[in-house]
Amino acid sequence: MWNSSDANFSCYHESVLGYRYFAVIWGVAVAVTGTVGNVLTLLALAIRPKLRTRFNLLIANLTLADLLYCTLLQPFSVDTYLHLHWRTGAVFCRIFGLLLFTSNSVSILTLCLIALGRYLLIAHPKLFPQVFSAKGIVLALVGSWVVGVTSFAPLWNVFVLVPVVCTCSFDRMRGRPYTTILMGIYFVLGLSSVGVFYCLIHRQVKRAARALDQYGLHQASIRSHQVAGTQEAMPGHFQELDSGVASRGPSEGISSEPVSAATTQTLEGDSSEAGGQGIRKAAQQIAERSLPEVHRKPRETAGARRATDAPSEFGKVTRMCFAVFLCFALSYIPFLLLNILDARGRAPRVVHMVAANLTWLNSCINPVLYAAMNRQFRHAYGSILKRGPQSFRRFH
C-alpha cells in the first residue's frame, strides 16, 4: 500500500471515492483559514507597536512556515485529492515534497526556540538577552530554514507521489535509513524537547507561586502588627516597596500575552530582567520588610495584590504555550503512530488519509489560538479587519 506511484501519479482507489470530497472541503477550509490568519498575524506583528519585539520574530518565522504550506502547497493537495491524481509533473512533485518537509522542520525548530526562550525568560532572565540577542535571533531564523532545506535536500530523488496519502512525499523504502533518522530527530527528539521545556516552565511557575504565597502570609502578619501599634510613617519606604513589586507587573515580568505559537510569547514589554526568578526574588525581599504606615495601607494592598497576581500571569503563559504545543503534537501523533504500527500498510487507505489530513491543522490553528488567548493580537486582528488600510496609520 505504501508503494509509490511515480509512473502515472495516480492515487485512485475505490475505498476513498467518497472520502475525497470531505478531504477537499477540509483542505479548502485549512487553506483559506490558514492564509487569512497567518497574513493577519504578520500584519499584526508589523503594525502593532507592542508586538514589535525581538522575540516575536520567532512568531513571524513560525507564521511564514505555516503560510508557505497553506498558501502555496495546500491548493495542490486539494487538487490532487479532488482528481485523485497529481497533475503537475514529476519535477514539481519533488519541489512540493521538499517544501512540505522544509515547512514542517522549520515549524518544529521554531517551536523549540520559542520554548527555549520562554524557559530562559522565566528561569534565567540574565541569560535570555545573551542567547536571544539581535544577532542571535537573526542567526536562529536563517539557520532554521538552512537546516530545514539541507536536511531534506538529499531526498530529492526519492520524492514521489505516495498513493496511500495522495501526497508527494519521500518513498519510505528508498529513503531508508536516512528518513528514519530525520523523522526521529525532528518529530521525536524535537517535540520531546519542547515538552521538556514546558515542564520546566511549569515547575518554575509553581516555585514562584509558592514564594508569593509565603509573601502573602508574611504580609498579612505584618499588617496585623501594624494595626496593633505602628503609626509612625517612614518617608520614602512605600515608594521603595512599591517599586519592588508593583512596578514589576505583567509588562516587566512574565507577560500573560503569549506568542506563538504556540506559540508562544508576545512579550508586550520585552524586558530581559523579567521572569519568575526575578519576581520570586522581589517577593522574598519585600517579605522581609515592614509596612509601618496604616494610612497608606490601600496603596500597599494594591501593590501586594499585583505581586500575588503574578502566579496567575505565569499560569496564562504556561497554558498558552502548552496549548500551542499540544495542538501541534496532536495533529501529528496519529499520523506518526499509524506509520509505526502499520509499517506494512495493512490498514485501510482511508485511515491513512484521515491521519495525514489531520496534520493540515497545525498550519492554520496558531492564529486562532493567538486571537483566543492574546489580547494584543486580538485587538490588532480586529483593527485590521474593521479599518483596513487605516489601521496601518493608527499604529505608527
Swiss-Prot record:
Gene Ontology annotations for the cellular component aspect, listed alphabetically: plasma membrane; receptor complex
Cell location: Cell membrane
Keywords (A to Z) from UniProt: Cell membrane, G-protein coupled receptor, Glycoprotein, Membrane, Phosphoprotein, Receptor, Transducer, Transmembrane, Transmembrane helix
Inducing factors: By lipopolysaccharide and other pro-inflammatory molecules in the monocyte/macrophage cell lines. Also induced by high glucose concentrations and the presence of oxidized LDL.
Tissue expression from the record: Expressed predominantly in hematopoietic tissues. Expressed mainly in the bone marrow with transcripts also detected in spleen, the lymph node, liver and the lung.
Biased composition (Basic and acidic residues): 290-308
Superkingdom as given in the UniProt entry: Eukaryota
Protein family (similarity comment): Belongs to the G-protein coupled receptor 1 family.
Subunit details: Interacts with ARRB2 and ARR3.
Name of the protein this chain belongs to: G-protein coupled receptor 84
Organism: Mus musculus (Mouse)
Lineage per the UniProt record: Eukaryota, Metazoa, Chordata, Craniata, Vertebrata
Gene behind the chain: Gpr84
